[in-house]
Amino acid sequence: MGLIFSAVGEVYELSEEQFPVFSAIAGASGAFIHLYIDALASAGVKNGLSRNFAENLACQTVLGSAYLTKQSDEHPIELMDTVCSPGGTTIEGVHTLKILGFESAVHQAIDAIIEKDKKLGSC
């Protein structure tokens, strides 16, 4: 069975206890990424880019970052640090996202999905 599925993607073996977390991340994160891409594009439009160009730019940036993370042996935070110059614009944006609770919001969203899954008895 794994051979069939591996032809179209990666196959993971996990325990029953891990399935709700897997399902939350694999199932919902696509929606989160679409939301993030839209937020990037909307910020671009707000600051003078056309919608089409801003969406394409956001998509290409997310694709490139995801590809680099997948291909690299470095932790995502290490990769982030490579593009954050001390005192620069990128670290300023990262700092702002952290202050506004970006990571916490993602964690809370995953936790909410797992809790909802438990209430629905899906897993």
Model-predicted regions and their roles:
Residues 55, 59-123:
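NAD(P)-dependent Rossmann-like dehydrogenase/reductase catalytic/cofactor-binding core
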Residues 10, 27-30, 88-89:
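Gly/Ser/Thr-rich helix-start
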Residues 1-21, 33-71, 116:
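Internal alpha-helical scaffold of NAD(P)-dependent oxidoreductase catalytic cores
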Residues 25-26, 49-51, 78:
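A ubiquitous short alpha-helical element
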